[in-house]
Regions:
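Short, surface-exposed, polar/charged, turn-prone segments marking secondary-structure boundaries
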Residues: 46, 69, 123-128, 222-225, ...
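Short, low-complexity, polar/charged sequence segments that are solvent-exposed and flexible
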Residues: 37-41, 115-119, 155, 166-168, ...
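Transmembrane beta-strands of outer-membrane beta-barrel pores
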Residues: 22-30, 44-46, 53-55, 63-69, ...
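Beta-barrel outer-membrane channel/assembly domains of diderm bacteria
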Residues: 1-96, 136-146, 218
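Short, Lys/Arg-enriched charge-dense amphipathic segments
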Residues: 83-87, 119-125, 135, 219-223, ...
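Surface-exposed coil loops of outer-membrane beta-barrel proteins
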Residues: 21-33, 70-80, 92-183
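Hydrophobic, lipid-facing positions within transmembrane beta-strands of outer-membrane proteins
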Residues: 43-47, 81-86, 130-134, 176-180, ...
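Detector for outer-membrane/organellar transmembrane beta-barrel domains
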Residues: 11-13, 57, 175, 180-254
Length: 254
């Protein structure tokens, strides 16, 4: 296994790298102006394993340890697993990845480390970020990159993703998500751009589309970005309406 190979070569630190990411704090919840509960709480605990087997072959595995352990019907993976892929550098310009990976969306908020984000925008909060599939990256020069990706369009069943389906909507025979992404930087890396377009068949003959654009400026200690995102689909593409219309489960803690 890759792990056995890694532990036999401790001097080659590129082969196996293990990181533990933790984000915790003290939360105080108020209800109607009065303190309801105050306690320490972990927001994120993640195990992150990366490595390079050789100059061409590499891998990445990352899993959240505090939630998302229910298996997903379509991918047969826990939602807690964010990365589980291997990559291969075909040559200096082309790189292939296969497995569960982040979707090649544009924008800069999406690309930030989740531990550094206090509150996501609705678009990034509800978009499916990690899906199983394959990706191909092409880098014509040091300042430009074009990536093409095909992944599943969802992790679980249609009902899990969209709730109760409208009359006449049937599941697609090939539930795939297609993404084209372009990244570039200009003026000696002063300006950075990250754009993407995506499409998927949500149900038979029913499609969704999304566009992500990100512009950033990085000059010494100054860093700022501005993202514009748009999504449209026959079924609730982000799950916002689905979440609002799901029946609440009543019950009291004992």
């Amino acid at each position: 296994s890759l792990f056995e190979y890694a532990i036999k070569i401790p001097k080659r630190n590129k082969v196996f790298n293990l990181d533990l990411e933790m984000h915790a704090g003290f939360n105080a919840d108020f209800f109607s102006g009065k303190l309801d509960e105050a306690a320490f709480r972990f927001r994120d605990v993640k195990i992150d394993v990366t490595g390079e087997v050789n100059d061409r072959l590499f891998y990445w595995y990352r899993q959240t340890l505090n939630g998302g352990y229910e298996g997903q019907a379509l991918e047969n993976l826990n939602e807690s697993i964010e990365y589980a892929y291997i990559g291969y550098k075909l040559n200096e310009r082309f790189t292939l990845t296969a497995g569960k990976q982040d979707v090649f969306y544009g924008g800069f908020e999406y690309d930030e480390n989740p531990l550094l984000i206090y509150e996501y925008s609705d678009m990034n909060e509800y978009s499916l970020c990690y899906l199983t599939g394959i990706g191909l990256g092409y880098q014509p020069n040091e300042s430009q990159e074009i990536r093409l990706q095909v992944t599943n369009s969802r992790m679980g069943s249609m009902e899990d993703e969209y709730g109760r389906l409208p009359e006449g909507f049937k599941k697609p025979r090939v539930p795939l998500f297609y993404t084209l992404n372009w990244n570039g930087n200009f003026l000696d890396e002063l300006i950075h751009l990250r754009y993407s377009v995506s499409a998927a068949e949500q149900a038979q003959g029913k499609y969704m589309y999304s566009v992500f654009t990100g512009q950033s400026i990085e000059a010494g200690p100054v860093y700022a970005y501005f993202d514009v995102m748009y999504s449209r689909g026959k079924l609730d593409p982000l799950g916002l309406l689905t979440e609002l219309t799901q029946p609440e489960v009543s019950g009291e803690e004992e």
